[in-house]
Regions:
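A conserved hydrophobic secondary-structure block that centers on an alpha-helix together
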Residues: 138-172
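Carbohydrate-interacting/catalytic domains
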Residues: 1-133, 138, 159-168, 375-379, ...
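Hydrophobic faces of well-ordered beta-strands that scaffold small-molecule active sites
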Residues: 131-133, 172-174, 229-231, 260, ...
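Active-site neighborhood of glycoside hydrolase catalytic domains
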Residues: 223-228, 233-288
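N-terminal small/glycine-rich loop or linker at the start of catalytic domains
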Residues: 128-147, 194, 232, 362
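Aromatic- and acidic-residue-enriched carbohydrate-binding clefts of CAZyme catalytic domains
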Residues: 146-152, 180-224, 237-254, 346-367, ...
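Conserved alpha/beta catalytic core and glycan-binding cleft of carbohydrate-active enzymes
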Residues: 99-101, 268-405, 413-417, 450-453, ...
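Carboxylate/His-rich catalytic cores and anion/metal-binding grooves
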Residues: 165-186, 330, 340-342
Length: 564
């Protein structure tokens, strides 16, 4: 093995034809060395001083260094440290096992592994056609009830792809899959937030410990089923914007990732979106405006009409957002309708952690109950929540497990819970089959009507010259929106571009009393048909309404009507 002059870029270990280049930032005046280990050994077999520098980057190249035979770390100012730019790490293959570079149990791998993508590419599903599904790689299948062979892994997700595809989803959003430290001084880091090794997929998320191949296999399998893969990348505040951009480009090019969810407080979403390499990659952010508005409307708060009308029609792409009523940071949907207060006692922080204001409503009793009237109301509210999410025109995202009533027992902050509290309980699927099937056909219904996912945001103007605005709002009187503060009901009419196409009218009654809705008069030859409602579910065939001028909605009911 021979030491030669190295290059300062790219950072990390770069395998070339006959040598490996090492480049690492080192503060000025600090001594640094490269440590080499035989694969699997915890004692360095060689040490090479890092003397050449460009700025504060030390670099060297080693001719004759076989990537299959060696692992490495750095020694900087007397401290053993891993390479933050490494593509894979040894010692992290087992979830929950504490390893560290200081005792050589954590080492960097020299990645040089060809992969056959079989012609795979990013899917580029149009933003307005996306139906997203948010999950935690481990929590999605770790529970024995998942009945997969490789629980809590990328492979577990692949085993569940038939389920995901049948549901109607075409994008999965994964919580952090990079190599984070799950064992911290204060708590278990289940979610993966905080400092991490961002360039390396998590080894413990692969059944065989090979996170690189595991993530690639999952992405390729998802793409074959027409499902995009989006990664949440909540970089810590210490990571420079330049490194964030480099990391995102790496995952897009090396792993064919379709999109990223970023923290706009740390990096400009607009600047990342303008990156020439990432120009056609979805760059997104969490925003809770839709969530807060629809939760309050769902439970019957007053004064919500203006916000509701905006979020029913607002498209997501321009703002780099997506609509959700529940997410990992808060209650599941089942808990949203079952608890008024958070119950985070198991987190060990005296119930002081997690959001205090959840805009939830327990329907009359806190937590589990056998009272049939309460259970029926909760089921109604969950269906209404899915109506609000899937019939809004922005891009919807379902929290994994909500479609079958998964519960976290009132815990709205499971960041440290790696157990049955945070894992999906798949046994609920058979118990809540009716809810699951309702969600599945509601997703199919959304896809059936392009008026529910337009390419351009509707404005209330007559764009087609038919004399009818593209979107209008109605109440007990047609063309008169009930915008009074006490109103908890709204009719929304989406007009078709041509006389031949179907019209859509959605009546939302979140009030605890019944309300009449006046129906706009259709063009000659068309009639109003019931297509779906909270009570009836999604009808296999549209049912002609006996009354064509108005419709009565029971309390807490949504009705979807089409004009044809």
């Amino acid at each position: 093995m021979k030491k030669t002059e190295g290059k300062p870029l790219p950072f990390g270990a770069t395998i070339q034809k006959d040598k490996v280049n090492f480049a690492v930032p080192v503060p000025e005046g600090k001594e640094a060395a490269l440590l080499l280990y035989r694969v699997g050994e915890e004692t360095p077999c060689m040490s090479w001083p890092l003397e050449d520098s460009v700025g504060e980057v030390r670099c060297l190249a080693l001719e004759g260094c076989d990537p299959a035979e060696y692992e490495y770390n750095y020694e900087i100012d007397g401290e053993i440290v891993p390479d933050a730019y490494a593509r894979a790490y040894a010692g992290k293959e087992v979830w929950g096992k504490e390893t560290k570079a200081s005792d050589h149990t954590l080492r960097c791998k020299l990645y040089d592994e060809p992969y056959d993508w079989e012609g795979d590419k990013q899917l580029h599903i149009p933003y307005h056609k996306v139906i997203a599904y948010a999950l935690h790689v481990r929590g999605f299948t770790q529970d024995a009830s998942s009945k997969v062979a490789h629980r809590g892994t990328f492979q577990g997700i692949v085993e569940k792809l038939p389920y995901i595809k049948e549901l109607g989803v075409n994008q999965i959003q994964c919580m952090p899959v990079y190599e984070f430290e799950e064992c911290t001084e204060s708590h278990l880091n289940y979610w993966g937030y905080g400092k991490a090794y961002y360039f390396a997929p998590k080894s413990a998320y692969a059944a065989d410990g090979n996170g690189i191949k595991g993530l690639k296999d999952m992405v390729k399998a998802c793409h074959k089923e027409g499902i995009e893969v989006v990664l949440e990348m909540p970089f810590s505040s210490e990571v420079p914007g330049q490194v964030i951009g480099e990391c995102l480009r790496y995952y897009m090019m090396e792993y064919h990732i379709d999109g990223f969810i970023l923290n706009p407080m740390l990096i400009s979403i607009e600047s990342v979106s303008a990156d020439p390499i990432l120009k056609t990659t979805k760059i997104m952010q969490h925003r809770e405006d839709f969530q807060g508005t629809m939760r309050r409307f769902l439970k019957g708060d007053e004064g919500m009409m203006e916000a509701v009308t905006y979020w029913l029609r607002h498209l997501s792409e321009e703002d780099h957002i997506f609509n959700y009523i529940t997410s990992h940071t808060g209650f599941t949907l089942k808990d949203l309708v079952s608890y008024d207060e958070k119950h985070n006692e198991e987190n060990g922080e005296n119930n002081q952690d997690g959001p205090d204001y959840n805009n939830s409503w327990n329907c009359g009793i806190e937590g589990p109950t056998r009272k049939k009237s309460i259970l029926s109301l909760r089921k109604t509210q969950m269906k209404n929540a899915f109506f609000l999410l899937l019939l809004s025109q922005g891009t919807p995202c379902i929290l994994a497990g909500d479609e079958f009533g998964n519960s976290q027992k009132g815990n709205n902050n499971v960041y440290c819970q790696d157990n049955a509290v945070s894992w999906l309980n798949w046994s609920q699927l058979s118990k809540e089959k009716e809810l699951h099937d309702f969600v599945k056909v509601l997703i199919a219904l959304r896809k059936e009507y392009p008026l529910l996912y337009p390419e351009k945001e509707m404005t209330g103007a007559d764009r087609t010259g038919r004399g009818v605005p593209d979107v209008s709002y109605h109440g007990e009187e047609a063309w008169r929106a009930p915008f009074e503060r006490t109103s908890r009901q709204l009719g929304v009419y989406y007009s078709a571009a041509t006389r031949e196409e179907e019209e859509c009218f959605i009546a939302y009654n979140m009030h605890w009393t019944k309300h009449d809705f006046a129906l706009p008069i259709l063009s000659k030859g068309k009639n109003w048909y019931l297509r779906a409602s909270t009570q009836d579910g999604v009808l296999t065939e549209p049912s002609l309404l006996k009354e064509q001028k108005k419709v009565e909605l029971p309390p807490r009911t949504v009705m979807f009507i089409t004009g044809r």
